[in-house]
């Protein structure tokens, strides 16, 4: 007897491909769906090979397969946001935006239109029930854990979402793929932003932003001009390489001012801070933070969680006070909270105190 119908987001990669197999083995009726998201004016990013890989896997596993076009919504909610953030002197996190508006909104709704009871992805996260609520738990494979990107999810989404890969090590996923004859078993993991395969975000913005990127001044902490920069989109907090200025000592980006079009340069000690303000906060194990709470937090995907006090503020904001200084806290990035192995929530870094 079927456990229900699952609409699976298929990318043509090994994780979503093996997810299809696991779900089918567990007794679900699986529908494979590939999302056509973006075409750069220079090349087709959502290329035919990825879609064809997904289609071949679906045929191999004998599951229905569909391609849906979400290009317009992806442009409005991910591409435009990505460009606007860099133009505003912030460093965006497009994967967080994509999960919030595309995978767990547009795809979530598409799954219902296909008659699915659940949706599934190949993300490395676990969804469990604790104290009567659905929570997101760190993956078995700590190196592949993707919970950092998931803090925006709501209860109604978690109740209808399955993430099979969270229970496995990546090597095991590849072994399963090879054992069942999927030719994507050794396909490389994507390391860059999916719509910028060459990892040149500045070039991407120049191609897709129809106005000139203005050069400006590098200034020191006192406001003295110390050089020329090629446009604020090319810089982020903590950056040292590629500045093109010689000061006789290591120089770091410590602030970006979009109003004056200035990039502020300082020393390494200037990029270590302990406090920040985050906006658009969402919590998962509970609806609202009523009082200060001791949790662990991290300010980028690759960072290790560090002890911090999360203090509720008005307008869905929090103040985060770390016990230890954090390197290069960056406006526009996400600060994400953990309670041991549980993803407690997160928000967008708005200010550095």
From Swiss-Prot:
Belongs to the MnmA/TRMU family. It catalyses: S-sulfanyl-L-cysteinyl-[protein] + uridine(34) in tRNA + AH2 + ATP = 2-thiouridine(34) in tRNA + L-cysteinyl-[protein] + A + AMP + diphosphate + H(+). This is tRNA-specific 2-thiouridylase MnmA 2. HAMAP family: tRNA_thiouridyl_MnmA (MF_00144). One of its GO terms (molecular function) is tRNA binding. Transmembrane segments: none annotated. Its EC number is 2.8.1.13. PANTHER family: MITOCHONDRIAL TRNA-SPECIFIC 2-THIOURIDYLASE 1, TRNA 5-METHYLAMINOMETHYL-2-THIOURIDYLATE -METHYLTRANSFERASE. It comes from the Bacteria. InterPro entries: MnmA-like (IPR004506), MnmA-like_C (IPR046885), MnmA-like_central (IPR046884), MnmA-like_central_sf (IPR023382), Rossmann-like_a/b/a_fold (IPR014729). Residues 144-146, 300-301 are annotated as: Interaction with tRNA. The keyword Iron-sulfur does not apply. It is found in: Cytoplasm. One of its GO terms (biological process) is tRNA wobble position uridine thiolation. The keyword tRNA-binding applies. It holds the Pfam family tRNA_Me_trans_M. ATP binds at residues 9-16, 35, 122. Keywords: ATP-binding, Cytoplasm, Disulfide bond, Nucleotide-binding, RNA-binding, Transferase, tRNA processing, tRNA-binding. GO terms for cellular component: cytoplasm. Disulfide bonds join 98-194. The active site is at residues 98, 194. NCBIfam families: PRK00143.1, trmU.
């Amino acid at each position: 007897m079927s456990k229900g119908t699952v609409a699976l987001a298929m990318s043509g990669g090994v994780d979503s491909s093996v997810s299809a197999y696991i779900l089918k083995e567990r007794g679900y009726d699986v529908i494979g769906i590939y999302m056509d998201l973006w075409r750069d004016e220079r090349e087709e990013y959502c290329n035919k090979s990825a879609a064809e890989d997904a289609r071949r896997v679906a045929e191999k596993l004998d599951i229905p397969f569909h391609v849906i076009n979400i290009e317009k919504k992806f442009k409005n909610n991910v591409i435009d946001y990505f460009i606007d953030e860099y133009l505003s002197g912030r460093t965006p996190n497009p994967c967080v935006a994509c999960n919030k508006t595309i995978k767990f909104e547009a795809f979530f709704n598409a799954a219902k239109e296909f008659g699915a009871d659940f949706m599934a992805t190949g993300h490395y996260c676990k969804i469990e029930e604790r104290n009567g609520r659905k929570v997101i738990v760190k993956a078995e494979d700590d190196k592949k854990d993707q919970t950092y990107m998931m803090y925006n999810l709501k209860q109604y989404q978690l109740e209808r979402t399955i993430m099979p890969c969270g229970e496995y090590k990546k090597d095991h996923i590849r072994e399963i793929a090879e054992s069942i004859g999927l030719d994507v078993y050794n396909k490389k993991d994507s390391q860059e932003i999916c719509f910028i395969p060459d990892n040149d975000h500045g070039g991407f913005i120049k191609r897709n932003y129809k106005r000139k990127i203005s050069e400006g001044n590098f200034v020191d902490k006192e406001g003295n001009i110390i050089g020329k920069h090629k446009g604020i989109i090319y810089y982020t907090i903590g950056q040292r390489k590629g500045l093109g200025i010689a000061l006789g000592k290591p120089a770091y980006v410590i602030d970006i001012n979009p109003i004056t079009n200035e990039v502020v340069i300082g020393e390494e000690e200037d990029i270590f801070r302990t406090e920040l303000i985050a906006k658009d906060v969402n919590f998962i194990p509970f609806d609202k933070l009523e009082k200060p709470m001791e949790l662990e937090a991290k300010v980028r995907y690759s960072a290790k969680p560090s002890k911090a006090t999360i203090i509720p503020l008005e307008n869905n904001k929090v103040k985060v006070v770390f016990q230890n200084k954090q390197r290069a806290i960056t406006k526009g990035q996400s600060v994400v909270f953990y309670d041991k192995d549980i993803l407690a929530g997160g928000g967008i870094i708005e200010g550095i105190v």
